[in-house]
Amino acid sequence: SGITNSFPKWTIQGGTGRAVAMLQDPSQRGVIIEQLEQGKDVACLTLGDPTIYSTYIYIHRIVKAHGYATEIINGIPSFCAVSAKLQDSLVDRSEQLHIIPSTYDIEAALELPGTKVLMKAASKMPLVKATLKEKHMTGTMIENCGMPEEHIYHKIDEIPERASYYSIIVVKEGNHD
């Protein structure tokens, strides 16, 4: 019968820690739990896939811990959307694929074989760019993939020092012709 209520928007600026803290606060958690107690269905929409670096999974776990039935419906992972936008595969044949958050040791990550997908790269952009240059590696960054503000950077030098939270860098080994 349509959307009757909306929940507070948990902004990216607050981060996952803020969202988890809000859900642990009974007055905030109540927004969701009250709806369920009234027999209403609740849906949470997220960008990308709800199981990959998504704040949603914390909501899911709390709702499930309160004894309510939960269901996760997969989405299109952002790195797959990026690959499609670039019109290329992420990996071919027996190549390895590594999905790496920016909180990981970037230098160690770039030593891994195969394709590296650097998620949430904006938080360490100067370090990421410097490390890629130092290692003579190339990569492509898509900022805000699928959104009106989408921008593709094909060269490391083109990538701005400050980029959107929704920035993904793909670093590939070898040719994919």
Question: Where in the sequence are the language-model features?
Answer:
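A contiguous loop/helix-start segment that scaffolds small-molecule binding in enzyme catalytic cores
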Residues: 42, 110-177
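Class I SAM-dependent methyltransferase SAM-binding "motif I" and its flanking Rossmann-like core
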Residues: 51-112, 160, 174
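Class I S-adenosyl-L-methionine
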Residues: 1-68, 157-159, 167-168, 172-176
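Short acidic active-site motifs
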Residues: 28-31, 104-108, 127
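Generic secondary-structure signature for well-ordered alpha-helical cores
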Residues: 30-37, 69, 88-91, 133-138, ...
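Short, surface-exposed amphipathic charged segments that create phosphate/polyanion-binding patches used
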Residues: 18-26, 85-88, 111-115, 153-159
